[in-house]
């Protein structure tokens, strides 16, 4: 009887372990796939603004992969390194890049591992953004032109986590801005998994944590709030209270108890990506029209829009309207940076 019970227990444990490993592998394959470069978009791509915003292409290593980046505004008086969100590319944040250059900053952007022009089979995991930003900071410190400039960080979502998490190891950073970021990869994994399958997700949490540690080692344990506290670097943490991707009262960096060197902006009614968009009536009206036109096109092709038709549609979008920024927020960020620099 005891042997039979032991076998049943071992079988249950085996099923649990194999299910945990399998589920973790499946989730990572789905969530952290390779992200291609954008070929058409409702927002500006570099080809749309190349003449007005010349840039220098650079390469640097992050682990086994070579990342591709671009330096804009070489005559700027301070360097902003931008870290993009998961599923996006550096080009997604071109409106912010152009705005910073117009204010007199030099900007280094790059495609993270497994993204766009950079190497990598996939984006690996939630800790990868900080690993790549480490590499970008090391590159800037060795670049003949960039090493002369004071360094500032700007990140959103995946990149928002990175912009704070790297501070403990990069005290040369003068200030950092984290938009819609999370505190730790593990907290966000649990929050998102619970949203999909409820409390049962915590049965598989150890496998996700183990997977991150196998991939990233000690880097998997980085806490953005702890890095802010230990570094003493001025940090501006911005989050929308209507963010459903990273909850402002959950895994978000802004939900943590932060040290006095951190300033926070919890913005009513703002979502995960609305922080990046213009807040004008013209933008709202125009994007409503674009979305309605695209929905009609989608229905006309039963959801299978040919690539050439899709490209033609986006070519007709007025990028001078869609390619703006939230001026008030960006001005607050500029003031924050300038205060930290002086």
Residue spans of the language-model regions?
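Hydrolase active-site cap/lid region
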Residues: 165-217
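The serine-hydrolase catalytic nucleophile loop
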Residues: 86-99, 112, 249
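Conserved alpha/beta-hydrolase
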Residues: 97-119
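Short alpha-helix in the alpha/beta-hydrolase fold that links the catalytic acid
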Residues: 233, 247-257
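An N-terminal hydrophobic leader/cap segment in hydrolases
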Residues: 8-61, 68-70, 291-317
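Catalytic active-site module of serine/aspartate enzymes centered on a nucleophile-bearing elbow/loop
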Residues: 280-342
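Short beta-strand/loop motif that positions the catalytic acidic residue
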Residues: 230-232, 237-239, 243
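Alpha/beta-hydrolase active-site loop
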Residues: 92, 123-144
């Amino acid at each position: 009887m005891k042997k039979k019970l032991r076998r049943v227990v071992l079988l249950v444990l085996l099923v649990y372990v194999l299910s945990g490993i399998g589920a973790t592998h499946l989730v990572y394959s789905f969530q952290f796939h390779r992200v291609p470069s954008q070929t058409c978009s409702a927002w500006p791509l570099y080809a749309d603004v190349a003449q007005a915003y010349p840039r220098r292409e650079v390469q640097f290593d992050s682990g086994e992969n070579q990342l591709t980046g671009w330096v804009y505004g070489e005559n700027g008086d301070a360097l902003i390194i931008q870290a993009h969100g998961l599923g996006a590319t550096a080009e997604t944040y071109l409106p912010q890049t152009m705005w910073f250059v117009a204010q007199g900053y030099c900007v280094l952007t790059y495609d993270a591992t497994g993204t766009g022009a950079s190497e990598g089979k996939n984006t690996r995991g939630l800790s990868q953004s900080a690993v790549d930003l480490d590499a970008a900071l090391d590159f800037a410190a060795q670049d003949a032109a960039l090493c002369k400039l004071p360094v500032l960080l700007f990140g959103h979502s995946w990149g928002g986590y990175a912009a704070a998490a790297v501070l403990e190891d990069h005290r040369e950073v003068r200030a950092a801005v984290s938009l819609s970021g999370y505190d730790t990869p593990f907290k966000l994994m649990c929050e998102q998994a619970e949203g999909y399958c409820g409390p049962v997700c915590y049965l598989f949490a150890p496998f996700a944590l183990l997977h991150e540690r196998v991939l990233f080692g000690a880097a998997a344990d980085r806490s953005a709030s702890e890095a802010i506290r230990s570094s003493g670097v001025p940090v501006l943490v911005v989050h929308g209270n209507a963010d459903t991707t990273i909850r402002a009262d959950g895994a978000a960096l802004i939900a943590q108890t932060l040290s006095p060197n951190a300033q926070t902006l919890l913005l009513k009614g703002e979502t995960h990506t609305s922080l990046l968009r213009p807040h004008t009536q013209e933008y709202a009206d125009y994007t409503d029209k674009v979305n309605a036109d695209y929905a009609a096109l989608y229905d006309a092709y039963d959801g299978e829009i040919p690539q050439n038709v899709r490209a033609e549609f986006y070519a007709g979008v007025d990028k001078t309207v869609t390619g703006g920024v939230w001026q008030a927020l960006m001005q607050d960020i500029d003031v924050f940076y300038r205060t930290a620099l002086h």
